[in-house]
Amino acid sequence: MFGEIKNFHGERIDHTFHQGDANSKNLVLLGHGVTGNKDRPFIVTLAEALAAAGVNALRFSFAGNGASGGQFTDATISKEVADLGSVLDAYAGWNICYIGHSMGGAVGVLRASQDPRIRLLVSLSGMVRTAAFAQREFGTVKPGAGCMWDDEACPLSQAYMDDLTQIGTVLDAAPKIKVPWLLVHGKEDDVVPI
């Protein structure tokens, strides 16, 4: 709808706009999880359902994921927080609800804790304890030599592991969030347990 979106590094952020109410300035941004992208079936289905209900939606891939510019090995939570800022810049003046899944949930918490442009926040199975996640899921994988969940398209980088460890947890950001926030999390989630 608004043409190309680029992040701070000049990398293109691939995105698809789903028109809901053409007269509305309300917009739901949909952020994916680690190893995901904007074209994951449930992200597409959610965007289509929102548009059918009259709600404008934008699904996008963080840099290094899907058809966005950049390298997957450069993708970190901190970089994705900045990417989300670039998307918010492109949609200045809109009333934004951000829905983030898994790692995208952690991105939303960190961005919403510092950016009042996010007016509503939804975390779907949001990553909370990032350092624990890194060790639990990838602690036996050598960065630069191994892959996330044995997926060759998703090489594990030292930058990713260092970023998760440095963040530690997003719990410290939670008290800074001053907008309505919905947490949706299944108690049987084995990738991001409660």
What do these predicted ranges mean?
Residues M1-N23:
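N-terminal cap/lid segment of alpha/beta-hydrolase-fold proteins
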Residues T35-A47:
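The serine-hydrolase catalytic nucleophile loop
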Residues K38-D39, N65-Y91:
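Catalytic nucleophile-loop/oxyanion-hole region of alpha/beta-hydrolase
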Residues A47-G69:
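Conserved alpha/beta-hydrolase
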Residues G100-G104, G108:
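Gly/Ala-rich beta-loop-alpha elbow adjacent to hydrolase catalytic centers
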Residues Q114-Y160, V179:
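Hydrolase active-site cap/lid region
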Residues K176-K178, L183-H185, D189:
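Short beta-strand/loop motif that positions the catalytic acidic residue
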Residues D190-I194:
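Conserved alpha/beta-hydrolase "acid-adjacent" motif
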